[in-house]
């Protein structure tokens, strides 16, 4: 598929780029997308939750009342989970939620995510640009020129560009990543995908394998 190349002023440069059909025009595999997003979100979890169980609650193990003759149910330690302040039955323990996913599935998921954005016509290709210094106002001007000021957008760079990244960091709806940092979640979480020309070769090289 062919896409027009714009400059940072939102004007057409008169050039077009050919996007690989094997990356941007496949039939999306929804299950692969589901698995990759699930893995990404699972990996974000700290898993540090912890509740004290019966043996871990502070306090005496003394039997709180005699076994018979009270007319009420038998009771042992005040740590019994039935009592207020007692331990929790099968409480949460610290654990890792991460799980492995084959590289083939991850690549398929990302190709599917790119294809979904292409089908929705939400991909913009912009010629490479740099800022001499971090400047949020300059980045906002780029968003305005591209019609993305109030939209959640993801800019994909070919190489790490510190000034461009720092210029966007204070913008809540804008995310800037290099092609090596891309995830299926990041692609789908953005309404619009802005691909800098320099990122295309790396994207297609990584995902065409």
Swiss-Prot record:
<comment type="function">
    <text>Forms part of the polypeptide exit tunnel.</text>
</comment>
<comment type="similarity">
    <text>Belongs to the universal ribosomal protein uL4 family.</text>
</comment>
<keyword id="KW-0689">Ribosomal protein</keyword>
<dbReference type="GO" id="GO:0005840">
    <property type="term" value="C:ribosome"/>
</dbReference>
<dbReference type="Pfam" id="PF00573">
    <property type="entry name" value="Ribosomal_L4"/>
</dbReference>
<dbReference type="InterPro" id="IPR013005">
    <property type="entry name" value="Ribosomal_uL4-like"/>
</dbReference>
<dbReference type="GO" id="GO:0003735">
    <property type="term" value="F:structural constituent of ribosome"/>
</dbReference>
<dbReference type="GO" id="GO:1990904">
    <property type="term" value="C:ribonucleoprotein complex"/>
</dbReference>
<dbReference type="InterPro" id="IPR023574">
    <property type="entry name" value="Ribosomal_uL4_dom_sf"/>
</dbReference>
<comment type="subunit">
    <text>Part of the 50S ribosomal subunit.</text>
</comment>
<keyword id="KW-0687">Ribonucleoprotein</keyword>
<dbReference type="InterPro" id="IPR002136">
    <property type="entry name" value="Ribosomal_uL4"/>
</dbReference>
<protein>
    <recommendedName>
        <fullName>Large ribosomal subunit protein uL4</fullName>
    </recommendedName>
</protein>
<dbReference type="GO" id="GO:0006412">
    <property type="term" value="P:translation"/>
</dbReference>
<keyword id="KW-0699">rRNA-binding</keyword>
<feature type="region of interest" description="Disordered">
    <location>
        <begin position="45"/>
        <end position="78"/>
    </location>
</feature>
<comment type="function">
    <text>One of the primary rRNA binding proteins, this protein initially binds near the 5'-end of the 23S rRNA. It is important during the early stages of 50S assembly. It makes multiple contacts with different domains of the 23S rRNA in the assembled 50S subunit and ribosome.</text>
</comment>
<keyword id="KW-0694">RNA-binding</keyword>
<dbReference type="GO" id="GO:0019843">
    <property type="term" value="F:rRNA binding"/>
</dbReference>
């Amino acid at each position: 598929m062919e896409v027009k190349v714009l400059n940072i002023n939102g004007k057409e440069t008169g050039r077009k780029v050919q996007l690989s059909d094997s990356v941007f025009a496949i039939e999306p595999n929804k299950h692969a997308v589901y698995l990759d997003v699930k893995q990404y979100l699972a990996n974000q979890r700290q898993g540090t939750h912890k509740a004290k169980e019966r043996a871990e609650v502070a306090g005496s193990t003394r039997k709180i009342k005699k076994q018979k003759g009270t007319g009420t149910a038998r009771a042992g330690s005040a740590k019994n989970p039935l009592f207020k302040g007692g331990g929790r039955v099968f409480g949460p323990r610290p654990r890792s939620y991460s799980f492995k996913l084959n590289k083939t599935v991850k690549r398929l998921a990302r190709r599917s995510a790119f294809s979904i954005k292409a089908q929705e016509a939400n991909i913009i290709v912009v010629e490479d640009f740099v800022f001499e210094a971090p400047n949020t106002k300059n980045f906002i001007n780029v968003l305005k020129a591209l019609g993305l000021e109030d939209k959640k957008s993801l800019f994909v760079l070919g190489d790490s560009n510190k000034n461009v990244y720092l210029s966007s960091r204070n913008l809540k709806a804008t995310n800037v990543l290099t092609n090596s940092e891309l995830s299926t979640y990041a692609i789908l979480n953005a309404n619009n995908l802005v691909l800098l020309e320099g990122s295309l070769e790396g994207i297609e090289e990584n995902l065409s394998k």
